[in-house]
Amino acid sequence: VIGMFCGMFNGLGITILRMPHPFIMTLGTLYIFRGTGNLISGGVPISGFTEEVRLLGNGRIDLTWLGLKESQYLPVSVVLIAVVFFLMWAFLNHTRTGKWIYAIGGNPNAARAAGINVNKILVIVYSLCGLLAGFGALILAGRADSGYPNAGLNAELDAIAACIIGGASVFGGRGTVLGVFAGVMIMGILRNGLNLN
């Protein structure tokens, strides 16, 4: 929920201040939110999460019911991420708001002329992005069994790279959830492959 409010803050700032490019606002608030997190935590990891939070990051689903000879597991986090990707695909491709998001990304002035409430949709988009970022942070904290103030440092660069590799435009109006999924997979393969000795 905190992530959603951080995203809403960005969306309101961009729409009210009429920022020429959203990167100005989002990069500025990135440092504000990161500094606030360090201030609240005192710069040290926070531990003592509930079993439910640990389950998000470290939980496993036993797949022996599929008739496999060996005990195989599927991480809960993989299932959660797959569900999020499916829901976002359905939202962007099968709802009116999803179509409006593409229209606003392509040409906000034309979308406004077509009767779309651009500011409202932008606030919704930034709120949703903040909610999903918070959800991802919760999974990461569950995986590490503690919240590190510097966890996810420079993850924004990986996210931007994955989106661009997946065919999304930094200027808006282009991109698909499946393309972003492919970009995430490519980035994961490259990152893991480069870490091998």
Where do the PLM segments sit?
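Alpha-helical transmembrane segments within multi-pass membrane transporters and channels
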Residues: 1-29, 182, 186
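Helix-loop interface residues and adjacent transmembrane-helix termini in multi-pass membrane transporters
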Residues: 16-20, 94, 171-174, 196
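Hydrophobic/aromatic residues within transmembrane alpha-helices
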Residues: 32, 110-111, 164, 186
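Start (N-cap) of specific transmembrane helices in multi-pass transporter permeases
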Residues: 118-130
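Alpha-helical transmembrane segments of multipass membrane proteins
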Residues: 8-13, 35, 85-87, 134, ...
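Transmembrane alpha-helical segments in multi-pass inner-membrane proteins
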Residues: 126-127, 133, 143-197
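Transmembrane helix-bundle core of multi-pass membrane transporters
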Residues: 22-100, 121-124, 143-152
